[in-house]
A protein has these predicted regions:
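Short, cationic motifs built from Arg/Lys/His that form the positively charged side of catalytic pockets
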Residues: 9, 30-31, 146, 173
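Hinge/beta->alpha junction and helix N-cap segments in small-molecule ligand-binding domains
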Residues: 17-65, 83-90, 112-114, 129-138, ...
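Flexible loop/turn connectors
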Residues: 68-177
Length: 177
């Protein structure tokens, strides 16, 4: 995210689209990182945390409203939209194509997770990828540490879960310059 925003300082990042998650959940850090990075680089931003639903149709209906709002509020302006996951980014991209028939120069989209839909979309979507190999390796190290601790004569169990942050990577595709 830092790379994407630093690279596009003149670009007006208008929205982070996500569900409103409790601050104690690690996924909240995506929202916090978005805000912190925009503030650090003096980039105006808005958060839209109203996305929730139990079906694709419900989510798509909400995404239509969000897209219409952004499109109406900022005509002719550059709009960078960071979405909570690649599925949301694909929905948003579809809405743009339904209205314009292409991805106008005034829009740039970034998804999150590097899921298959990001590369399979009508235009491959720029995304923030999690380093699954590093996550798996780190998880295994933590598991082995806990197993070794349990072998001790007087094992000391963890007082609370260990949270490790693994640096994600920006995967540039066709929805950003």
């Amino acid at each position: 995210l830092h790379k994407a925003i630093r690279r596009q300082r003149q670009m007006c990042i208008r929205d982070s689209i996500n569900a409103d998650v409790p601050k104690i959940i690690p996924a909240y850090n995506r929202i916090r990182a978005f805000e912190d990075t925009c503030k650090e680089h003096h980039v105006p931003y808005e958060l839209n945390l109203n996305v929730c639903g139990d079906s694709y149709q419900e989510l798509f209906s909400q995404m239509k409203i969000i897209f219409a709002d952004i499109d109406e509020k900022y005509p002719g302006q550059k709009k960078g939209v960071f979405l909570a996951n690649d599925t949301y980014a694909n929905m948003f991209l579809n809405l743009i194509f339904q209205k314009y028939g292409c991805l106008p120069d005034t829009y740039e989209l970034v998804g999150f997770d590097n899921s298959p839909i990001a590369s399979e979309a009508i235009l491959p979507i720029t995304t923030i990828g999690q380093q699954i190999d590093v996550i798996a390796h780190t998880s295994m190290e933590l598991l082995v540490q806990q197993m070794e601790e349990r072998k001790k004569r007087k094992p000391v169990p963890l007082a609370e879960p260990i949270h490790k942050q693994i640096t994600p990577i920006l995967i540039r595709r066709e929805t950003t310059n």
